Swiss-Prot record:
<keyword id="KW-0408">Iron</keyword>
<dbReference type="Pfam" id="PF03786">
    <property type="entry name" value="UxuA"/>
</dbReference>
<dbReference type="GO" id="GO:0030145">
    <property type="term" value="F:manganese ion binding"/>
</dbReference>
<comment type="pathway">
    <text>Carbohydrate metabolism; pentose and glucuronate interconversion.</text>
</comment>
<keyword id="KW-0464">Manganese</keyword>
<comment type="similarity">
    <text>Belongs to the mannonate dehydratase family.</text>
</comment>
<dbReference type="GO" id="GO:0042840">
    <property type="term" value="P:D-glucuronate catabolic process"/>
</dbReference>
<keyword id="KW-0456">Lyase</keyword>
<dbReference type="GO" id="GO:0008927">
    <property type="term" value="F:mannonate dehydratase activity"/>
</dbReference>
<dbReference type="GO" id="GO:0008198">
    <property type="term" value="F:ferrous iron binding"/>
</dbReference>
<protein>
    <recommendedName>
        <fullName>Mannonate dehydratase</fullName>
        <ecNumber>4.2.1.8</ecNumber>
    </recommendedName>
</protein>
<dbReference type="InterPro" id="IPR004628">
    <property type="entry name" value="Man_deHydtase"/>
</dbReference>
<dbReference type="InterPro" id="IPR036237">
    <property type="entry name" value="Xyl_isomerase-like_sf"/>
</dbReference>
<comment type="function">
    <text>Catalyzes the dehydration of D-mannonate.</text>
</comment>
């Protein structure tokens, strides 16, 4: 595996490249251009500036998260072809900079959802929580206000305020889009973009829906083994793959995470992975924990063993961490707990590797 660490850039992150460079085993960062409006082409010049900044710190830039998909593409509007052409050009530019994997998602309106960005845990740390009862009791506008107030001035990925200004209008448009129509729109997008990925040797990796069920009546289509497999078969190319986010898929206890890793891993379709843990608190409700197995509801040893069993050589990053030791940072993306998560992942990998060599 290749261990990487998400970084939001000098303008948007409290974590520095120098700090990331000092985390044992981390080879590169997962980056993006956050000032380019969704749907516009990422200029090669700006991509190269980011690459040079990262490489100057002794790290690699081979994974991008995310090149967001314009809402018109998800809705299947007549304007989608222009945005798809822009997406294809962005992939070509990223390939010229040496990028190997592009993460994206196909979630309508909201890229992810939490109901509390600063849940206090008994040890004094802060984490993010999702309580489905609260979703059922508020309007989208009220929830956006709550998230904006809890962001502490940081721009949260997928919650860029310019994207949410037309919220009511966007919700009206989605009244005509059910899960089947959204899936058709995803296939339309992939059929046009994947050939460019093949041409440029850039793998496209869809991120599962977070959480993996419908919210506010919006359709969700990347939530379990069955619909992921359907998506992969619809455009059957090794360049059409997934970002295996165990936190997103693992929010549904019916998803067998190690089994899914083995299944899709043997197909060669896991191009990128997010590893984190969470604790179930009720039906469709959870909060995010530190990475170790005893902290949450998932067995990280079995998760990492599944990756090792398939001979995974792709990219893995520690996902959301708690805010600990008084750190003030973007919710889920401070330095310390994610660094602890990175070393935990690395330690599990080393232990599994040595056990196999010794006893097999």
């Amino acid at each position: 595996m290749k261990l990487v660490f998400r970084w939001y850039g000098e303008k948007h992150d409290t974590v520095t490249l120098e700090q990331i460079r000092q985390i044992p085993g981390v080879e590169g960062v997962v980056g993006a251009l956050f000032d380019i409006p969704v749907g516009e082409v990422w200029p090669l010049e700006e991509i190269m500036k980011l690459k040079e900044t990262v490489e100057k710190a002794g790290l690699k830039l081979e994974v991008i998260e995310s090149v967001n998909v314009h809402e018109d593409i998800k809705l299947g509007l007549p304007t989608r072809d222009r945005y798809i052409e822009n997406y294809k050009e962005t992939i070509r530019n990223l390939a010229k900079a040496g990028v190997k994997v592009v993460c994206y998602n196909f979630m309508p309106v909201f890229d992810w959802m939490r109901t509390d960005l600063h849940k206090k845990l008994p040890d004094g740390s802060e984490t993010m929580e999702y309580d489905h009862r609260l979703i059922e009791g508020v309007t989208p506008d009220e929830l956006i206000k709550r998230v904006k107030e809890g962001s502490q001035g940081f721009v949260l990925p997928g919650w860029e305020w310019d994207r949410l200004e037309k919220l009511r209008e966007t919700f009206e448009l989605y009244k005509n889009v059910d899960e089947e129509k959204l899936f058709e729109n995803l296939v339309y997008f992939l059929e046009r973009v994947i050939p460019v990925c093949e041409e440029c040797d850039v793998k496209l990796a869809i991120h599962p829906d977070d959480p993996p069920w419908s919210i506010f009546g919006l359709p969700r289509i990347i939530t379990n083994k069955e619909n992921i497999e359907r998506m992969l078969k619809a455009v059957d190319s090794p360049y059409n793959g997934i970002t295996f986010c165990m936190g997103s898929l693992g929010a549904n206890p019916e998803n067998n995470i190690p089994e899914m890793i083995r299944y899709f891993g043997k197909m060669g379709r896991i191009h990128f992975a997010h590893v984190r843990n969470l604790k179930f608190t009720g039906e469709k409700s959870f909060y995010e924990t530190a990475h170790p197995s005893f902290c949450g509801s998932h067995d990280l040893f079995e998760v990492m063993k599944a990756f090792h069993d398939i001979g995974y050589e792709g990219y893995i990053r520690p996902d959301h961490g708690r805010l600990i030791w008084g750190e003030k940072a973007r919710p889920g993306y401070g330095l310390y707990d994610r660094a602890l998560g990175a070393t935990y992942i690395l330690g599990l990998w080393e232990a599994i590797d040595k056990m196999k060599k010794r006893y097999c």
